[in-house]
Amino acid sequence: MNAKLIPLPNAKHLSDEEMKSRSEEFYRHIKQRRTVRDFSTEKVSRSIIDNCILAAGTAPSGANMQPWHFAVSGQGETRKIIREKAEKEERDFYETKASAEWLKALEALGTDANKPFLETAPFLIGIFVKSYGILPDGSQVKHYYAIESVGIATGILIAALHNAGLSTLTHTPSPMGFLNKIFKRPKNERPFLLLVAGYAEKGAQVPDIQKMSLGEISSDIS
């Protein structure tokens, strides 16, 4: 075994009471998170976004390869280009690609091909999966469980942004290949999703939908 090991940093053994309190507090906070489609143009400090990305970067990953990249776009001309290309793909989706069943499932969310939030929100974060790494000499390094790892990191990023007081929306135009050119990402990376981040517009509304209960999403096996 050649691994270099160190003591677990900040190891704590909390009481059951403290752990229960913390877990309940986190649940109360995170259950207030909602996907928002009406974003304010109010500016958000870039340092807040950077801190949340740093939190995402602490996610576990296969063989610690950390196969993610977060490309940040503030408000500017690039955002208009992203919106135009994304809406083109969305129109194709709604008009020709989506099945009737899929469109029916989307009705409760009130979505359509118009994506104004791609311009109005202060930040877009293009999240990319590194299919493989590239060493300084140009050779390739295999990445393990890259998609799963980036999915976990994205979840942490969404939770961190919510904790900071910001709203988010996950957007996945299909196909997303145009994002590589816009965000200037290399061929070993492919788009995972676009994360919209900012303050919700005053008076913003969200669909009247519910999350599943504990009994519906979990089970006990003896």
Language-model segments: which ranges?
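N-terminal accessory segments that position/regulate proteins before the catalytic core
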Residues: 1-36, 40-48, 84, 92
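C-terminal helix-cap and adjacent tail motif
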Residues: 2-18, 22, 112, 193-222
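Small-aliphatic-rich amphipathic alpha-helix that forms the alpha element of a beta-alpha
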Residues: 33, 52-56, 125, 131-182
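Glycine-rich, charged/polar anion/phosphate-binding loops
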Residues: 55-57, 108-113, 179-181, 204
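Short, basic and Ser/Thr-rich N-terminal targeting/leader segments
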Residues: 64-67, 119-121, 190
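Glycine/small-residue-rich phosphate/adenosyl-binding loop
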Residues: 72-150
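A glycine-rich helix N-cap at a beta->alpha junction
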Residues: 91-98, 184-207
